[in-house]
Amino acid sequence: MSASTPVSSGHERDSADLAGFGYQQELKRSLGTFSSFAVAFSYISPSTGIFTLFALGLTTLGGVFIWTWPVVALGQFLVALNFAEVSSHYPVAGSVFQWTKYLSSRSYSWFTGWIYLFAGILTVTAVVATLPLALIPALNGLGWDSLDSGSLGTNEVVALITLAVITVLNIYGVRLVAIINNTGVLFEILGMFVFAIVLMAFHNHQGFHVVTNSAGFHVGPSSFLAAMFMSLFVIYGFDTASTLAEETRDPRRAAPKAVLFSVIGAFIIGGVFLLGVLVAIPNMHTAVTGAFNPATIIEANFSSSFATIYLLVVSAAIFVCCLSIMAATIRLCFGMSRDNQLPFSKPLAKVAPSLHTPVWTCIAVAVLAAVPFLKYSGAGIIAIAATGMIYLSYFLGNIVIMRARARGWPKITAPFRLGRWGIVVNVVALLYGGSMLINFAWPRAASNPKPAQTGGLLSFGIGFVNKIPILWTVVVVIAAIGAIYYFAAGRRKDFAVVTAPAPDDPLPAAGPVPQVEN
């Protein structure tokens, strides 16, 4: 009996902490620190981003593009430090939306949450569209020779099946997701690291000086910024550890650790994997002209059976990434709906008593993530649009945190704190984030093309829209839809819990958080 006391008291403490924010403990609190880290690391998933946009970096700067990796990792680590401190103060589902809610005006918070929600939904689309890049060659290696890896139709079918599967798994609960995540993270870390070492030891065709081989491309600020997009697509989503705070034990301590270690782990594992793939390129000229992705390079170096095993490991890692991103987006949608801030908030905020999951939110996120497949143009274009919106959300969040710091926040001590370094970290993170936003928005065929520049892959059917960079169109449309809803109905809604607790459950104290600092 005594052995269970710490667990019980810990659960009661976490539930009481959540009640202080005006929320009832409905989601099942079953994640430890490693599981929290695993979910955040799975969201980042170096293998997923590298498989999606490796060809973009290679065809822009050759092997030199690997130097974009530490630059982006450092910039994102500064953002992560900022987020880690805030997550220690506000351990509730919704990350950037919740932080801006407590530190800024209502309108600012709502639009930040709206943009971040659709950035997450687009990211779900992008990662399920990435899985076929590794899975189809792996299935072909197992004898499914009829699958055409170059067919957008085949890729689309595999992506939609993946979306359906991860939706069902998320409906059945965070504990199941955590078990799969924990296993998948170990596979990804060991698989990427071990296979990279094998590539460097036994298939080192280029030599380590490949990192200085630009393959004849001019190395300058413009080309370096364009080559950054693979790295930019990988290292984000670390705030997922905070998004799942209501399902994490002792989240004020666990979430900040998971946020930071997920970035560090992704930087190390992803960097080693990138180097291994680059040195294993049989012929740089052929790889550049053929826009090789990692699957092609792996198949060129290993026997069919060995390459198939490796691609299956990578496919598993990407699948876990899909699962994690879906889980994080569902929690954000749930957090906003619980506060009565979205259309159909009541059903979206309803938690199934037996599953402890918001079932309708899971379904809604899946349906919205499927919409881009109506005009499917490949994983790369969706990935760039999704990443640009994520960085916009992060930048909006960092602005609010900086404003709060200027007014004396934090005034209350939390387990993780930056102290006097907080303002310095925040300022540099804003400078980095702002420069990356300009980079995302800059119109260029490689990273923010107009539909007319996609070679027929994408057309909106409206002449002048096809001449506007894709990211601009996506942001404007999503912001416009949000503005129409907010000013027509949303702004008249209070931040209020819209689902009543079960009859036998105590009603938590309503109102603002006792430790809210403005």
Q: What is the role of each PLM region?
A:
Residues M1-F54, L58-V64, F77-L81, T212, ...:
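Membrane-interface "cap" regions at the ends of multi-pass membrane proteins
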Residues T48-S149, S262-I268, V272, L471-I478:
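Extracellular loop-to-transmembrane helix junctions
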Residues F65-I66, L142-E156, N182-T308, L457:
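Helix-loop-helix junctions that connect adjacent transmembrane segments
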Residues V92, I115-T130, I235, D239-T248, ...:
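Membrane-helix boundary/coupling elements in multi-pass transport proteins
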Residues Q98-K101, V128-V157, G191, A245-G265, ...:
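Helix-loop-helix connectors at the membrane interface of multi-pass transporters/channels
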Residues T154-H205, V259-I264, A383-G397, W421-Y432, ...:
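Membrane-interface loop-to-helix entry segments
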Residues G380-I390, R420-N518:
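A generic transmembrane alpha-helix motif of multi-pass inner-membrane proteins
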